[in-house]
Curated annotation (Swiss-Prot):
The keyword Transferase applies. Its EC number is 2.3.2.22. Belongs to the CDPS family. This is Cyclo(L-leucyl-L-leucyl) synthase. It uses activated amino acids in the form of aminoacyl-tRNAs (aa-tRNAs) as substrates to catalyze the ATP-independent formation of cyclodipeptides which are intermediates in diketopiperazine (DKP) biosynthetic pathways. Catalyzes the formation of cyclo(L-Leu-L-Leu) (cLL) from L-leucyl-tRNA(Leu). Can incorporate various nonpolar residues, such as L-phenylalanine, L-leucine and L-methionine, into cyclodipeptides. InterPro entries: CDPS (IPR030903), CDPS_sf (IPR038622).
Length: 234
């Protein structure tokens, strides 16, 4: 059910350039993480409602089973069980999203739900993903940042289920990497992938790897018309 009182968020750009792009209000891509308790139905409804007022065009980014299940496998769940569990979780999000974006107040916005698998044959996406993988193999600083991001994702999952005991095997950290590699192209250049002029990827916290992607610390960089915004619900 849509909320009658307009939900309110603040959005803070990763850089001053991000803030300038956000102020244009052109396009927002809302990132949703399966298995993250932050993304309750109410929170997602509120964020979509707010974004649809703030930005002219809004789309949703949701992982597909193959990549998202990697996080569960890296958390110690059997591969078959992980895929089944991920399938159920993503179906739940898709049902909720289908309901929200089909309501009268949002239908005219033509909000799309984007999944990684939609881009399996997309040349631009595959090119960006290859650049990410090459940077991982060629740059020690980028490799370290990717591994740390993977570690933090697994740690968050284990903490959420009461299973974190202070150490995570490096092999498990590597298992979750494809999820990160699949997501980074949307951090780098959503305008190129979705055919919009400017775009802001919205999420509720900074990416640990983000600062380096914006300031030129790595072999790959964020495109000029791409921004990243940290949203906080008031």
């Amino acid at each position: 059910m849509l909320h009658e009182n307009s939900p309110s968020f603040t959005v803070q750009g990763e850089t001053s350039r991000c803030d300038q792009i956000i102020q244009k209000g052109d396009h927002a891509l809302i990132g949703i993480s399966p298995f993250n308790s932050r993304f309750s139905k109410d929170y997602v409804v509120d964020l979509i409602q707010w974004s649809s007022h703030y930005f002219r065009q809004v789309d949703i980014l949701l992982p597909c089973e193959r990549e998202a299940s990697r996080l569960l496998v890296a958390s110690g769940i059997d591969n078959v069980k992980a895929i089944k569990k991920t399938h159920r979780e993503i179906r739940r999000h898709l049902r909720n999203l289908d309901y929200v974006i089909s309501t009268a107040t949002l239908k005219s916005k033509q909000i799309r739900v984007i999944q990684f698998s939609d881009f399996s044959l997309n040349h631009d996406y595959q090119s960006l993903k290859t650049q990410v993988e090459n940077a991982f193999n060629e740059s020690e600083s980028f490799k370290k940042s990717c591994l740390d991001m993977s570690f933090q994702a697994i740690k968050g999952r284990l903490k959420g289920t009461g299973q974190y005991f202070g150490q995570i095997d490096l092999q498990l950290v590597y298992k979750a990497l494809p999820y990160i590699f699949a997501e980074i192209p949307f951090y780098l250049n959503t305008p190129r992938l979705l055919g919009v002029k400017y775009s802001t990827l919205l999420y509720h916290r900074p990416w640990s790897i983000g600062k380096g992607l914006f300031n030129g610390s790595y072999p790959i960089q964020v495109a000029d018309k791409q921004s990243y915004g940290i949203v906080t619900q008031l």
